[in-house]
Amino acid sequence: MLPTKQAACSFINVAFSYNELPLIRELSFSVYEGEYVCIVGHNGSGKSTISKLLTGLLKPQAGEIKIFGKTVDFDNVSYLRNNIGIIFQNPDNQFIGITVEDDIAFGLENKCFSRQKIKAIIDEVTLQTQTDGFIKQEPHNLSGGQKQRVAIASVLALNPAIIIFDESTAMLDPKAKKTIKQFMVKLAKQGKCVISITHDMEEVTKADKVLVMNEGKLIKQGKPVEVFTSEQELQKIRLDIPFSLSLSTKIRGITSTIDYQTLIKSIAKLWKKR
C-alpha cells in the first residue's frame, strides 16, 4: 500500500467578513503534498481572501486553518510563513536587492546562513529557474517572464512546502505564461503543494484539482474533467469553460458511428463560441 499523502493546508469551516460583508463563508478544503490546485472564480468570489488568510495577512473570524495538521496561531504566524511562499501578479513589488543575486540572497541572509551555503542555494535555484544567465542584472530591467522566474527563485531559495501563485501569469505574454505554468507542474511533481489563484481557465486543465469559488462559497471541487462537465451549473455564474475540456465533453457525447464531417462541424461550432 502506498503511503497516504499529508494535507499540507486545510481550511475548516473558515469565515471572514469585511464591514459586515461576508467574503468567505464556511469554507472547507484540503490541499496535499505534491498537489497542484487551481482556485478559480470571478472578482469578489473570495479567491484573494484565501491567499491573504494563508499568508497571515488576514485572521479568520471563524473556523481554523491547519498547516501540516497544526492549527495556525494567527497571533504568531512565524510557523505559517516558514511553510508558505507566494508569487504575486506584479513581481516588481517583491524585489528588494540591487541585483537578481542580491534579491535571492536577501531571505537567506535573514536566516543567518553562511555565505557558502547562500551561494550553493543561489546556484541551485537559479539553475532550476533558468535565471543563472542574468543574476548580476537589476531585476527591474528584466522582461515580465524573467521577473517572475526571479520571484520564483527567491521563494524556492527559502524552501517552503506550500507555494502560492496569486494571478502570477496575468501580465505575461503567451510564451512566458507557458514557462511559468510548466514550473507549477514541475514543482508539484517535486513534492511541493502548489496553489494557483487564477483567471486563466486553460491553466486549470493541467491542475490535479480545481476549486470553484462564488460569492465566498466553494461551489465545486474535484479534478478538472469532473468540475467542468457541469457546464450548465458553471454557466449560471458566468464562468468560462476551458475550450479543451468543453471539446472533450462534447466529443464523448458523440456516438462512435458519426462521420468526420459532422465531427468537424461540431468542433468548429465550439470554437466560434470561445
UniProtKB/Swiss-Prot annotation:
E.C. number: 7.-.-.-
Cellular compartments per GO CC: ATP-binding cassette (ABC) transporter complex
CDD domains listed in its UniProt record: ABC_cobalt_CbiO_domain1
The keyword Cell membrane appears for this protein: yes
Gene Ontology terms for molecular function: ATP binding; ATP hydrolysis activity; ATPase-coupled transmembrane transporter activity
SMART domains with a match to the protein in the record: AAA
Protein's cellular compartments: Cell membrane
Residues reported to bind ATP: G41, H42, N43, G44, S45, G46, K47, S48
Topology within the bilayer: Peripheral membrane protein
Enzyme class, first EC level, given as a word: translocase
Membrane-crossing residue ranges in chain numbering: none
Domain ABC transporter: 9-240
Alphabetic keyword roster: ATP-binding, Cell membrane, Membrane, Nucleotide-binding, Translocase, Transport
Keyword RNA-binding part of the UniProt annotation: no
Broad class of the protein's primary localization: membrane
Short name of any one Pfam family annotated for the protein: ABC_tran
Family: Belongs to the ABC transporter superfamily. Energy-coupling factor EcfA family.
Function: ATP-binding (A) component of a common energy-coupling factor (ECF) ABC-transporter complex. Unlike classic ABC transporters this ECF transporter provides the energy necessary to transport a number of different substrates.
Oligomer status and interactors: Forms a stable energy-coupling factor (ECF) transporter complex composed of 2 membrane-embedded substrate-binding proteins (S component), 2 ATP-binding proteins (A component) and 2 transmembrane proteins (T component).
Record-given protein name: Energy-coupling factor transporter ATP-binding protein EcfA1
Species per Swiss-Prot/TrEMBL record: Mycoplasma genitalium (strain ATCC 33530 / DSM 19775 / NCTC 10195 / G37) (Mycoplasmoides genitalium)
Recorded name of the encoding gene: ecfA1
